[in-house]
From Swiss-Prot:
Part of the ABC transporter complex CysAWTP involved in sulfate/thiosulfate import. Responsible for energy coupling to the transport system. The keyword Transport applies. This is Sulfate/thiosulfate import ATP-binding protein CysA. Keywords: ATP-binding, Cell inner membrane, Cell membrane, Membrane, Nucleotide-binding, Sulfate transport, Translocase, Transport. It comes from the Bacteria. ATP binds at residues 35-42. Its EC number is 7.3.2.3. GO terms for cellular component: ATP-binding cassette (ABC) transporter complex. CDD domains: ABC_CysA_sulfate_importer. The gene is cysA. It comes from Vibrio vulnificus (strain CMCP6). InterPro entries: AAA+_ATPase (IPR003593), ABC_SmlMolc_Importer (IPR050093), ABC_transporter-like_ATP-bd (IPR003439), ABC_transporter-like_CS (IPR017871), P-loop_NTPase (IPR027417), Sulph_transpt1 (IPR005666), TOBE-like (IPR024765). It is a peripheral membrane protein. Its main location: membrane.
């Protein structure tokens, strides 16, 4: 089922959570709403779900206007960050809850409920825990139960609000892989909110980057990372170093957003930490830096250095097999040449 959002505005007092947001989410896609805290991503999800009413604008599911309907009438499944499982119910009873709570005319019989719940528990690989209680499960297992419960009512769309935010890094990575596999089996239209760029890049078919209540860019993970349309997207998705173009031949760092040099307006340009060529010998066309720290991070080494021109921090990432690392120690001077840059006016 596709989702159409048109002209959504939402205010909380003087704060603008959504500012005239319009977007269509394709049927069967897994879409990440990505952005910093307060950008509007959770407000957008809650308005689509019917948990919040917009000040203006409409929400349609499969071209049917649902703006005036509450969450039960919209046929959406919603998964919260903190599970929201009933502690006094078994895992089986938690998953069955939505089915048993349906109006009598639409409520399945107990045999059908049992069959559906058992099938869902098998799908999320927790059928062997059906008689346990939430307190007896790990955080990752509880989140899978919450997802099974959301799927039990056969929703038209699935909405997830930072579903892995309360879990540790290793469990998050396992569940991201599991969610992607599950979606490929079910093909249900799904939106998930996250502030974790790695999570969005790894899991989603498409990413919607939001900032200050508006959409900055929509694209595939590769498009968002490789061809950011705005300065905000470049800075938010992936690590970056800010530079400015002094003239046609030279690059230099600056702490300012816009710099005028010799009467010329400098462009703001950026370089990823892994896109520097590192030289241990002086080069007149390179950026001179002094190494402050050398950090071993698994298969990568990160250098924290400071520009000799203005003391701006520069991050450089190298493979831990790079031979130049043997020559690099703290306080060592290096010369950096950007191999690839992105420019913004």
């Amino acid at each position: 089922m596709s989702i159409q959002v048109s002209g959504l505005c939402k205010h909380f007092g003087q704060f603008t959570a959504l500012n005239n947001v319009s977007i269509e989410f394709p049927s069967g896609g897994l879409v990440a709403l990505l952005g910093p805290s307060g950008c509007g991503k959770t407000s957008l999800l809650r308005v689509i779900a019917g948990l919040e009413r917009p000040d203006s604008g409409t929400v349609a599911i499969q071209n049917r206007d649902v703006s005036g309907l509450d969450i039960r009438e919209r046929q959406v499944g919603f998964v919260f960050q903190h599970y929201a499982l009933f502690r006094h119910m078994t895992i089986f009873e938690n998953v069955a809850f939505g089915l048993r709570a349906k109006p009598k005319a639409r409520r399945p019989n107990e045999a059908t409920i049992k069959q559906k719940v058992n099938r869902l528990l098998q799908l999320v690989q927790l059928d062997w825990l059906a008689d346990r209680y939430p307190a007896q499960l790990s955080g990752g297992q509880r989140q899978r139960v919450a997802l099974a419960r959301a799927l039990a009512i056969e929703p038209q769309v699935l909405l997830l609000d930072e579903p892995f935010g309360a879990l540790d890094a290793k469990v998050r990575k396992e569940l991201r892989r599991w969610l992607r596999k599950l979606h490929d089996e079910l093909h249900i239209t799904s939106l998930f909110v996250t502030h974790d760029q790695e999570e969005a890049l790894e899991v989603a078919d498409h990413i919607v980057v939001m900032n200050k209540g508006q959409i900055e860019q929509i694209g595939t993970p590769e498009e968002i990372y490789r061809t950011p349309r705005t300065e905000f997207v470049y800075q938010f998705v992936g690590s970056s170093n800010r530079l400015y173009l002094e003239d046609s031949n030279g690059l230099s760092f600056t702490p300012s957003d816009v710099v005028s040099t010799h009467g010329k307006q400098a462009k703001r340009i950026y370089c990823r930490p892994h896109d520097f060529a590192v030289n241990t010998q002086h080069r007149p066309d390179a950026i001179p830096v002094a190494v402050a720290r050398k950090l071993a991070l698994g298969n990568m080494v990160r250098l924290e250095a400071y520009s000799l021109d203005n003391q701006q921090l520069v991050e450089v990432e190298l493979s831990n097999h790079d031979p130049v690392l043997d020559e690099i120690q703290a306080k060592r001077h290096l010369w950096l040449t950007p191999k690839t840059v992105s420019q913004f006016a």
